[in-house]
């Protein structure tokens, strides 16, 4: 897996920011180092190189001033140009849809997914897109250090069942694209036998990360428990609202030049569809500045509770 990732902006998180919450982790690698690491251990995640698809930055700046940032053909060409230029033989695309995603409705998500898959196939790449739900946060954590800790739980087979199943399904699709036929059950076994965790640790070490720091809990000064004021079932946890809330804690950037606080964020104890009682913990908020009661009230307003349980389907559709 050779992956080039980006940074977060606004309510969206960035893979690079999360990895940089690990002490010493280097996201800048030369092309030679990147290729060698993938050959040696089979895995590397780095930042996007200025030497790759130089025209894309110019085109994005042009889109920004011509009201075409959300034009599907231009989004597709921007995303796929990087994947193709990086040399990937097989490409799995996660196209999110919903309140917290760039694509707000399923028709637009399908159109984007189909366009990118067709572009990949046109240049001889095995390409599949998965349309996934982003109406609520994926997993339980929002925030850089907190998301690394959740990922480590999953890699040790200790993650939430719904997220673990989702990741194993994506893993099966990725392996299929590489002509390795495995069942979801076989993929899951790698989480429980420790081999997936060992591979992640090998990447951290190869890119200068400190393994002791990797497992360190968040050092946020304040941890506030947000509790439910009514009983029922969680019906909404709007991903965008909570992403913006975490940004205000320092976990995200309002503008590209903002500094991040890696330790802050949110950990949900309950997700959509789950039952909750009065006084039960909905989430824990991690902050380095004291959290006001007004902020807690604002958080609670975004947690919707109803009388009926609601099922969330993480993978909505696969387009190949």
Model-based region annotation:
Residues 18-28, 62-69, 102-106:
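Glycine-rich tight-turn/loop motif centered on a GG-T
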Residues 18-44, 114-120, 124:
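A glycine-rich helix N-cap at a beta->alpha junction
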Residues 1-9:
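Active-site cofactor/substrate anionic-group-binding motifs, chiefly glycine-
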Residues 4, 38, 46-49, 79, ...:
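Short beta-strand segments
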Residues 68-75, 82-320:
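Well-ordered secondary-structure scaffolds
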């Amino acid at each position: 897996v050779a992956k080039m990732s980006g940074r977060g902006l606004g309510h969206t998180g960035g893979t690079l920011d999360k990895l940089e919450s690990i002490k010493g982790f280097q996201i800048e690698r030369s092309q030679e180092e990147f290729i060698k690491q993938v050959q040696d251990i089979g895995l590397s995640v780095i930042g996007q190189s200025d030497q790759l698809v130089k025209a894309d930055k110019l085109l994005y700046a042009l889109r920004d001033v011509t009201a075409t940032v959300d034009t599907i053909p231009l989004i597709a060409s921007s995303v796929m140009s990087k994947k193709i230029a990086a040399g990937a033989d097989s490409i799995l695309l996660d196209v999110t849809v919903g309140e917290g995603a760039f694509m707000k409705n399923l028709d637009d998500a399908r159109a984007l997914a189909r366009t990118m898959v067709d572009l990949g196939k046109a240049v001889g790449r095995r390409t599949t897109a998965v349309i996934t739900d982003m109406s609520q946060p994926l997993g339980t954590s929002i925030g850089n250090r907190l998301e690394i800790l959740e990922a480590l739980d999953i890699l040790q087979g200790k993650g939430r069942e719904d997220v673990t199943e989702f990741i194993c399904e994506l893993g099966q699709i990725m392996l299929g694209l590489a002509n390795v036929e495995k069942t979801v059950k076989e993929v899951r076994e790698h989480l429980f036998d420790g081999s997936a965790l060992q591979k992640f640790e090998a990447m951290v070490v190869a890119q200068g990360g400190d393994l002791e720091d990797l497992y360190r809990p968040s050092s946020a000064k304040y941890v506030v428990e947000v509790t439910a004021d009514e009983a029922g079932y969680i019906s909404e946890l709007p991903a965008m609202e909570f992403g913006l809330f975490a940004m205000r804690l320092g976990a995200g950037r309002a503008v590209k030049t903002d500094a991040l606080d890696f330790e802050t964020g949110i950990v949900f104890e309950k997700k959509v569809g789950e039952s909750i009682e009065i006084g039960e913990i909905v989430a824990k908020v991690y902050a380095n500045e004291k959290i006001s009661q007004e902020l807690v009230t604002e958080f609670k307003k975004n947690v919707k509770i109803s009388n009926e349980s609601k099922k969330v389907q993480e993978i909505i559709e696969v387009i190949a």
